[in-house]
Amino acid sequence: MKQICVIGVGYVGLVTAACFADLGNRVVALDVDEQRVANLKKGTMPIYEPGLEELVKRNTKSGRLSFTTSYAEALKGVEFAFIAVGTPSGVDGNADLQYVDAAARSIAKNMTAPLIIINKSTVPIGT
């Protein structure tokens, strides 16, 4: 069993977190949107994906999946941190990487031991 943090609970992040938890890992899914996290804790899904609601509820109930807004809580004891935050297009058409940058900085500030960081967000080549 691995300890995993997934940052961002949109389509990519929530599906990733739920699937890793269903494989038997302990997953903490983090989002800075307090309302989104509160809704997930109540079982309200922010997106639709066939089977996702059941997957989230089953793994939350088993204790393998939890949700938080706290980087310190989410990163405690984890081996892997997945960044799955939005990268919207800027007015010039380029990817806006501010959320990826903020997540990376927050990981650096709050990690207590070495960990592997995996970026699942869409970013330009060479980023």
Q: Which residues does each PLM region occupy?
A:
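Structural/interface elements that position substrates and couple domains in central-metabolism enzymes
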Residues: 1-127
